[in-house]
A protein has these predicted regions:
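N-terminal leader/targeting segments and the immediate start of mature chains
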Residues: 1-19
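Charged, gly/pro-rich active-site loop segments
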Residues: 2, 82-152
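Charged, amphipathic alpha-helical segments
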Residues: 4-9, 54-57, 114-120
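A short, Trp-centered hydrophobic/proline-enriched beta-strand micro-motif
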Residues: 13-29, 67-71
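A generic structural signal for short beta-strands and their flanking turns/coil linkers
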Residues: 19, 35, 43-45, 63-67, ...
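Short glycine/serine/proline-enriched coil/turn segments at secondary-structure junctions
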Residues: 29-31, 77-80
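Short, surface-exposed charged micro-motifs
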Residues: 38-39, 133
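A short mixed-secondary-structure module that forms the rim of ligand-binding clefts
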Residues: 40-78
Length: 152
């Protein structure tokens, strides 16, 4: 697969296969912080994630909306282990118009259907005011394989 052939759905499939990813944000004191996250859904041609407006991660992404994400799942044949890494810009959609509000509600509902943890945390209520969704834009990165890493 060449770079020009990689689609948002290829990235989503890779993230689903990995399961848990690690996202780096810039903390308010300008230091990086890495935490586990999980990609949730593709809607409107975008990768969507979620967070809680009371968490530090939300404040960090509001102040500096640039992140890097990395994920991998070690295979039995370690040399065949694939991993994904990319940087992107975070967008919390403004819900000022009816169309965007409907999209955000659709995304939140899909996330709650996918994730038992999110369903439980927000009591299956897409209107919970602390439940925030965001998508990534300007994604740049790569799919890699441990067998092709050079220079280590």
């Amino acid at each position: 697969m060449t770079e020009s052939q990689i689609t948002i759905h290829d990235i989503a499939k890779s993230l689903d296969n990995v399961g848990l990813q690690y996202m780096a944000t810039i903390v308010l004191d300008s230091k990086p912080k890495v935490r586990p996250v999980q990609y949730m859904v593709v809607r409107d041609g975008k990768l969507w994630f979620c967070t809680n407006s009371q968490k530090a991660m939300y404040a960090e992404m509001q102040a500096s909306p640039f992140v890097e994400l990395c994920g991998s799942r070690l295979e039995e044949d370690e040399i065949a282990t694939n991993w994904i890494r990319f940087s992107a810009e975070v967008v919390f959609p403004d819900e000022i118009d009816e169309e965007t509000r409907a999209l955000v509600k659709e995304v939140k509902t899909a996330i709650m259907e996918k994730s038992a943890i999110v369903h439980e945390l927000y009591k299956n209520d897409p209107n919970n005011p602390i439940f925030k969704v965001f998508y990534l834009k300007n994604i740049q990165g790569s799919f890699c394989n441990l067998g092709h890493v050079k220079g280590l």
